């Protein structure tokens, strides 16, 4: 299986927006090359996580090796790297692109170019990829291939005159894709006699084999029994197994330059394998590591707490297991007066947060409370100290803060021009600054700078609802800027509830505070005494709601008689309530927490 020379190897990835048919095209390529029999085929073969199939998205990058006999009679090895399309998994995309020389750009012929397609194409262009445009779903009545070709040329600047016309669902034209891979993509370069250099593309944990590493060999040969070294940590291991995915794991003797495959070397934890690291031979190490890719930095943080306090250790183990398969996910232990012991977790974005939460509840059967997502702020104190703030509850008093900087993003929004007005209004409500606005046919492309804090709550949902689902959105980080930000504390019966505090711009603080107080008033059960629910900035109260007391009719047992008897009982009740208000503790039920934290901002 490994005797295919390097000039007949093609490494490629598929770039597409969500739902443009990327995983379906991968299925057809696997079927046409006979990698799996018809009996073994399932839809979305490479999306092997139940969650991926259910949501129709690709989360983890997957690889598969296909052998294809081309029209010139020669057998080629095609290594397909299936990449995610969603903005939160851009890190997975950058890894996949670093391992390939070319890309198929799949665009839905009825919908045209979307924002996430753009972001990934620019990454591929930066990685010097040869890009082959493919128009999918040309069999649909709504398909407009000529308009979409023009759009590819105008928006991306790629020549689309020889774009391939296919329907991945029916299999129409998929054979032309295989031929194009052979004729239009370059072969990898590499020297089999040089020092071993292999790029660590991904790693995941297998319960039986330990850590499995996905590699792309650049130079040298990787073989079973070899002693290898990780160049970033200096750790050494002996290779137990070398193989390729076709798409099942298939052991081979060696991996040669230009090939992609996996190795298993009895590594205990994925923390020992840094994605983007260079693997070399321990006896004859390479002098220089390969250019890796940028490590991922979490941009959204939130607290995760078990509803049942006994599940804390189980949550720690579960987070550790997810971290094994997801290098971009961070967590550290923290405690909250209201919620007990839990973890502060860092994510690449909101979809990433949602996926991790869902995996915790499905795969590990955990019931969790998540605090409101927040971003990382940079604090400059008056004594010259600089802090990074992940948790709003840790924000110091305003008197010692010189300035606060918040992260901004540069967002690209593609939308049919009928909905442009609503989108522009939404962006300006969220303190957006317009950078660019261009028209391509009947679609507009708006580029905005927005504070990330305004995007993490419900911006994506609002964007979809004001554009009836037609807008697509993509962003990249765009530095930090000083801003007038305040911490809003929520007080229940004059006690601060740390889990509900949040940071907002001063202009929106009062409104947000009022909303959360009103929501809590509905959710907290009434007590025997009055409860004040307040929102405060420092010591200044900006919003208040009062939850009325339950009243017990203490005079019910008095039939007739003197009024002073009734008055005495009422006075006694009043005294008791006053004392209760002073010493009474208000238990906020978990359902109230969940609802308040889920509240649309």
Swiss-Prot record:
One of its GO terms (cellular component) is plasma membrane. Gene3D superfamilies: 3.30.70.240, Elongation factor 4, C-terminal domain, Elongation Factor G (Translational Gtpase), domain 3, P-loop containing nucleotide triphosphate hydrolases, Translation factors. It comes from the Bacteria. CDD domains: EF4_II, EF4_III, LepA, lepA_C. It catalyses: GTP + H2O = GDP + phosphate + H(+). NCBIfam families: lepA, small_GTP. This is Elongation factor 4.
């Amino acid at each position: 299986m490994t005797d295919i020379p390097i000039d007949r190897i093609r490494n490629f990835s598929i770039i597409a927006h969500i739902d443009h048919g990327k995983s379906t095209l991968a299925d057809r390529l696997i079927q046409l090359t006979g990698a799996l029999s018809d009996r073994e085929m399932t839809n979305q073969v490479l999306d092997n996580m139940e969650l991926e199939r259910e949501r129709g998205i690709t989360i983890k990058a997957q690889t598969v090796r296909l052998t294809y006999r081309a029209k010139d009679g020669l057998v080629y090895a095609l290594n397909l790297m299936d990449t995610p399309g969603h903005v939160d998994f851009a890190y997975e995309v950058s890894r996949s692109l670093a391992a390939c020389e070319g890309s198929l750009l799949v665009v839905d012929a009825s919908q045209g170019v979307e924002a996430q397609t753009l972001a990934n194409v620019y990454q591929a262009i930066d990685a010097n990829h040869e890009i082959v445009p493919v128009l999918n779903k040309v069999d649909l009545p709504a398909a407009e291939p000529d308009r979409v070709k023009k759009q590819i040329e105008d928006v991306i600047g790629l020549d689309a005159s020889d774009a391939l016309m296919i329907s991945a669902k029916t299999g129409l034209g998929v054979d032309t894709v295989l031929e194009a891979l052979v004729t239009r993509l370059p072969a990898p370069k590499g020297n089999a006699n040089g020092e071993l250099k292999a790029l660590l593309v991904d790693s995941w944990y297998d319960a039986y084999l330990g850590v499995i590493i996905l590699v792309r060999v650049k130079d040298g040969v990787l073989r079973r029994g070899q002693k290898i070294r990780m160049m970033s940590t200096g750790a050494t291991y002996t290779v137990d197994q070398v193989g390729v995915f076709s798409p099942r794991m298939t052991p081979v003797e060696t991996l040669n330059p230009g090939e992609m495959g996996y190795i298993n070397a009895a590594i205990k934890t994925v923390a020992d394998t840094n994605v983007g690291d260079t693997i070399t031979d321990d006896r004859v190490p390479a002098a220089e590591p390969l250019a890796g890719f940028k490590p991922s930095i979490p941009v959204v943080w939130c607290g995760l707490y078990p509803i049942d306090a006994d599940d804390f250790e189980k949550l720690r183990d579960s987070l550790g297991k997810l971290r094994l398969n997801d290098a971009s996910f961070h967590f550290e232990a923290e405690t909250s007066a209201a919620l007990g012991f839990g973890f502060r977790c860092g994510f690449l974005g909101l979809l990433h947060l949602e996926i991790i939460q869902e995996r915790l509840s499905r795969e590990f059967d955990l019931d969790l409370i998540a605090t409101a997502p927040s971003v990382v702020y940079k604090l400059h104190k008056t004594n010259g100290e600089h802090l990074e703030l992940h948790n709003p509850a840790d924000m110091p008093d305003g008197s010692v803060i010189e300035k606060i900087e918040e992260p901004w993003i540069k967002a690209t929004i593609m939308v049919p021009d009928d909905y442009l007005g609503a989108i522009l209004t939404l962006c300006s409500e969220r303190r957006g600054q317009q950078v660019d606005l261009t028209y391509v046919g009947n679609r507009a492309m708006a580029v905005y700078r927005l504070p990330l804090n305004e995007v993490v709550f419900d911006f994506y949902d609002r964007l979809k609802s004001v554009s009836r689902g037609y807008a697509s959105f993509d962003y990249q980080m765009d530095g930090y800027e000083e801003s007038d930000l305040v911490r809003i504390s929520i007080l229940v019966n004059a006690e601060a509830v740390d889990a509900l505090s949040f940071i907002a711009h001063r202009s929106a603080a009062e409104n947000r505070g009022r909303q959360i107080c009103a929501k809590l008033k509905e959710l907290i059960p009434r007590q025997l005494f009055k409860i004040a629910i307040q929102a405060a900035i420092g010591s200044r109260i900006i919003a208040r709601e009062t939850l009325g007391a339950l009243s017990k009719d203490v005079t019910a047992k008095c039939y007739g008689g003197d009024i002073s008897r009734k008055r005495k009982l009422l006075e006694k009740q009043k005294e008791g309530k006053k004392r209760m208000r002073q010493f009474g503790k208000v238990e906020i039920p978990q359902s109230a927490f969940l609802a308040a934290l889920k509240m649309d901002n």
